């Protein structure tokens, strides 16, 4: 018996408000600071005695991600996570999220559901409420913009400008894995596009770690929680998204100090020392 292919639902058939209703129908608020979420002209939040933190990131198809190898669910997860990371870098806790998405007619409802599934997965894991957003049509590919709100006690907020002479420079994880994962994906994409064999599959064996660091990064909320338990407030902090040297330059410039880094002291996992690619994690 021939299996029937389920017909995909077009976004045009739903319309903007139908799409929003469909994507947000299962949202339940978890944070006390979320008084009103999706369904009104604006969200209503109450942070009480804490200070509100706000950050936003926009991801453009062809600039920040390539759908040739980026699964849509991973894209949604990563879009949320890069915003959570900014809040954590201020020594805060992410609490609310707003999602703005621009899509073209080439996307079906099921594909948009995959993006939102990734976002909701990230929010569930980090106890963040989706409280609003917007949808629109796009003529230039997929656009995904996330705004994240968080909270922190005023005396525990950590800025880039607080570094002092004789401070110790620390990195919470290893370096270079996400970049090496990107290089591997780009290499395999080129090989795949040059193949005539329809059965050809990219070779990612043994490279799962660096691929996950690129496609499914994690915000270091665990570090913020551990610092709080130890009653430690860093003098300066920021997330490393563009590389160690550029982020240190930001901190040094804003703090009016210099720094010295010892390459042999940096933590590098074996998975990042990939001899198949002409790069080094810290070069």
Residue ranges and their predicted role:
Residues 1-283:
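Helix-biased detector of long, well-ordered alpha-helical tracts
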């Amino acid at each position: 018996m021939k299996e029937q292919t389920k017909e995909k639902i077009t976004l045009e058939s739903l319309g903007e408000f139908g799409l929003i209703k469909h994507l947000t129908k299962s949202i339940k608020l978890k944070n006390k600071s979320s008084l009103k979420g999706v369904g009104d002209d604006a969200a209503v939040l109450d942070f009480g005695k804490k200070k509100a933190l706000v950050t936003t990131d926009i991801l453009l198809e062809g600039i920040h991600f390539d759908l040739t190898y980026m699964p849509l669910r991973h894209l949604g997860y990563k879009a949320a996570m890069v915003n959570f990371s900014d809040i954590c870098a201020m020594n805060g806790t992410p609490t609310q999220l707003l999602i703005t998405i621009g899509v073209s007619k080439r996307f079906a409802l099921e594909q948009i559901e995959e993006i939102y599934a990734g976002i909701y997965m990230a929010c569930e894991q980090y106890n963040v409420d989706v409280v609003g957003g917007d949808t629109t049509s796009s003529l230039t590919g997929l656009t995904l913009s996330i705004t994240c709100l968080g909270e922190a006690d005023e005396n525990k907020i950590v800025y880039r400008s607080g570094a002092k002479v004789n401070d110790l420079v620390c990195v919470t994880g290893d370096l270079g894995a996400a970049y090496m994962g990107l290089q591997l994906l780009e290499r395999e994409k080129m090989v795949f596009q040059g193949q005539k064999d329809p059965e050809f599959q990219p070779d990612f064996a043994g490279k799962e770690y660096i691929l996950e660091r690129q496609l499914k990064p994690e915000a270091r909320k665990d570090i913020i929680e551990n610092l709080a338990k130890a009653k430690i407030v860093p003098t300066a902090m920021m997330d490393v998204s563009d590389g160690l040297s550029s982020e240190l330059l930001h901190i040094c410039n804003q703090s009016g100090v210099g720094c010295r880094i010892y390459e042999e002291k940096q933590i590098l996992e074996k998975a990042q020392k990939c001899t198949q690619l002409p790069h080094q994690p810290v070069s």
